[in-house]
Amino acid sequence: MLRTSATAAPRSPRRALVPVAVAALSASLVAAPAAAETAQAPAFDSYVSLGDSFVAGPLIREERVSSSMPLLGCLRTSNNYPTMLAERMGITDFTDASCSGAVVNDLYEPQFDDTPPQLDALTPETDLVTVGISGNDFGFSEVLLECAKQSLSNPLGDPCAEHYGDELDQRVEDLRPEVAGVYADIAERSPDATVLAVGYLQILPESRGCWPSTPIAWGDVPFLDRAQTALNAMIAEEAEARGAVFVDVFERGHDVCQSSDTRWVEGLIPENGAPVHPNFLGMRATADFVGAELGVPAPVDDAA
């Protein structure tokens, strides 16, 4: 049975052990067929992925064998977590409608001339939906660029917090009805679907940061971290109120200030992926978290 997160609070470091534990458990069940029968993941026939660039995965290099190329208009890669998840679950009726730069309105209107509204991908037969949306409506990119500019004047202070004041909290509250509407409309179009609202990976650490490689003033790092936590919490509340399951992927220790073999989100000068976006490791970790919510164990090589 799917479990529903009660809160969008940051993960304890112990949660990092979840994919490993799931993989170990699945291995032990191979030797016990009777037990395995009771632990099988639910089967899905028709999966639709909706969302923005944290779903689409712009500019992630092909680090695994794939026959498909990124969709250039939406900068959608075959290395994103929905594609990984569909492959792990053996789902062949899979539509990835996610698109870089998408805002909530792009779920209802064409984002480009040749890109239909994302919600058009849903049908009454759709039985699995993952969603990641509202980061662009909140203005992640604009806020980070403004804070980078502000940091030049006072890298040890909190100039961005002074610049925005309570505005970011208000942005989160203003987005509530839009996010609520998305999950209500998904339920109406695909009433039998299991719907998972996927949160945003941690971008910045809790404190200090790594100025100047990521030019956010030390005092502004916790300010922005709290803003992202508030956005994830709002998404969780509105999605769960409409029958969706929130998947908390906000696990600390994988932010832009970490080394390339540890971070899940790239910094302003990326090595694999777009600036301040998930990299391959981040997408793989997200697939692990979503899979665990569905009872799908991570591949053994992922958990190693």
Language-model features: locations:
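Secretory targeting and sorting signals
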Residues: 1-38
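A structural motif corresponding to the C-terminal end of an alpha-helix
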Residues: 84-93, 177-195, 230-248
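Serine-dependent acyl-ester chemistry module
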Residues: 142-170, 202-228
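Structural recognition of the beta-strand scaffold that forms the well-ordered cores
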Residues: 46-51, 55-57, 93-98, 127-132, ...
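Short, solvent-exposed beta-strand-terminating loops
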Residues: 52, 56-58, 135-149, 199-207, ...
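Short, well-structured alpha-helical segments in soluble
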Residues: 108-125
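Serine-esterase "nucleophile elbow" of acetyl-processing enzymes
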Residues: 39-98, 119, 148-153
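Catalytic His-Asp segment of secreted/periplasmic serine-dependent ester chemistry enzymes
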Residues: 201-303
